[in-house]
């Protein structure tokens, strides 16, 4: 109690000017705090940036996949996925991939009914694997499959490397070889063995051909709609072919086609057998995709220019200059800043206090 009285005496009798608090110059920095609202501070470090849109780039520290087959000229990713003639080549391994074709289509060969199946998803399915390769051997002998013997159909619209008639390497167009087996048939079943290396997923492409009644009788001896079923890895899919009603369509300078093909795929896990049940017009599986590992996929555009820390669906390639960013929120891969709704600042100074008022001597 005595100490307090003495202190008061000193303040009132000996000090004519006492300044309390911290004196500093005026500060333009304002931060919003959780407990005190907006507060002036003597210094801040910005933690956020607002990116500007840029081209997509290769992700630093890893290989980034643009086109499935960069050296396959004049080929779409679906052409590569179906192994169209002149569209086969090495697919580089990659831990990150750019989804640059929203609705993949084939550039030529036989007219495909893209929207009857999930075939448009095939390039993106393959893109999601780190390692992808096309088998060197056919998965089944199409010529001697049930319902045969068959001759393997080709098309002038699918020129091969010698500019002869060709077809997709992933499928064999099974056409009855002679008049004796150009007849209607009950559903037939073929087993599709697993031929990839243990641990790889096997992606098996198959399909069926249909045409107008005249052509169906000429090719297969049956003009009725045909039934097809695939089954693998617990997934079963059914189709019935459509007969006729297609306008003539030419692909890559070939003859006008009145027919269409429907193409699908099934995924066979390591060591697992698949089955296909079919009637006339079957496109039997041949070369299969063997795939392993995982590649992160993000929507973007080509070409890939330079390198970046982060790939962002809305902004392209970003280099991380701040830990957070504001702007459009979207999927991003790599060493990316974190999205926040409003800018963040880190106060690296002290709370600003105006100079204390002078106490006048009594």
From Swiss-Prot:
One of its GO terms (biological process) is symbiont entry into host cell. It is found in: Virion membrane; Host apical cell membrane. InterPro entries: Capsid_hemagglutn, Hemagglutn_HA1_a/b_dom_sf, Hemagglutn_influenz_A/B. One of its GO terms (cellular component) is host cell plasma membrane. Pfam families: Hemagglutinin (PF00509). GO terms for molecular function: host cell surface receptor binding. It comes from the Viruses. Homotrimer of disulfide-linked HA1-HA2. Residues 1-15 form the signal peptide. Binds to sialic acid-containing receptors on the cell surface, bringing about the attachment of the virus particle to the cell. Plays a major role in the determination of host range restriction and virulence. Class I viral fusion protein. Responsible for penetration of the virus into the cell cytoplasm by mediating the fusion of the membrane of the endocytosed virus particle with the endosomal membrane. Low pH in endosomes induce an irreversible conformational change in HA2, releasing the fusion hydrophobic peptide. Several trimers are required to form a competent fusion pore. It comes from Influenza B virus (strain B/India/3/1989). Keywords: Disulfide bond, Fusion of virus membrane with host endosomal membrane, Fusion of virus membrane with host membrane, Glycoprotein, Hemagglutinin, Host cell membrane, Host membrane, Host-virus interaction, Lipoprotein, Membrane, Palmitate, Signal, Transmembrane, Viral attachment to host cell, Viral envelope protein, Viral penetration into host cytoplasm, Virion, Virus entry into host cell. In natural infection, inactive HA is matured into HA1 and HA2 outside the cell by one or more trypsin-like, arginine-specific endoprotease secreted by the bronchial epithelial cells. One identified protease that may be involved in this process is secreted in lungs by club cells. Palmitoylated. Belongs to the influenza viruses hemagglutinin family. Glycans are attached at residues 40, 74, 160, 181, 212, 319, 348. Transmembrane segments: none annotated. It is a single-pass type I membrane protein. Major glycoprotein, comprises over 80% of the envelope proteins present in virus particle. This is Hemagglutinin.
């Amino acid at each position: 109690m005595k100490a307090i009285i003495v202190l008061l005496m000193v303040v009132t009798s000996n000090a004519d000017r006492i300044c309390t608090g911290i004196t500093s110059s005026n500060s333009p920095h304002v931060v919003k705090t959780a407990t005190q609202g907006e507060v002036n501070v003597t210094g801040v470090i910005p933690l956020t940036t607002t990116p500007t849109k840029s081209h997509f780039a290769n992700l630093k520290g890893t290989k980034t996949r643009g086109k499935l087959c960069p050296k396959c000229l004049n080929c779409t990713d679906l052409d590569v996925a179906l192994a169209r003639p002149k569209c086969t080549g090495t697919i580089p391994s990659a831990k990150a991939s750019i989804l640059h074709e929203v609705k993949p289509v084939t550039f030529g060969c036989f007219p495909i009914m893209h929207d009857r199946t999930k075939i448009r998803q095939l390039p993106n399915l393959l893109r999601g694997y780190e390692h992808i390769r096309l088998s060197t051997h056919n998965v089944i002998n199409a010529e001697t499959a049930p319902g045969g013997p068959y001759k393997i159909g080709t098309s002038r619209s699918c020129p091969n490397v010698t500019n002869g008639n060709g077809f997709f390497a992933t499928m064999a167009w099974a056409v009855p070889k002679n008049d004796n087996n150009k007849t209607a048939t009950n559903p037939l079943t073929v087993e599709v063995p697993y031929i990839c290396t243990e641990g790889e997923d096997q992606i098996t492409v198959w399909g069926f051909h249909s045409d107008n009644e005249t052509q169906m009788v000429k090719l297969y001896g049956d003009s009725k709609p045909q039934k097809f079923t695939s089954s693998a890895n617990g997934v079963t899919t059914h189709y019935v072919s459509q007969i006729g009603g297609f306008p003539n369509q030419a692909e890559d300078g070939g003859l006008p086609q009145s027919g269409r093909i429907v193409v699908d795929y099934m995924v066979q896990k390591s060591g697992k057998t698949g089955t296909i049940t079919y009637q006339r017009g079957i496109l039997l599986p041949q070369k299969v995709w063997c795939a392993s590992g995982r590649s992160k996929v993000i929507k973007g555009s080509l070409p890939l220019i330079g390198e970046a820390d982060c790939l962002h669906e809305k902004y392209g390639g970003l280099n991380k200059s701040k830990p957070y960013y504001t702007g459009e929120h979207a999927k991003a891969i790599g060493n990316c800043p974190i999205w926040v709704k409003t800018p963040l600042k880190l106060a690296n100074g002290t709370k600003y206090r105006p100079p204390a008022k002078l106490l006048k001597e009594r």
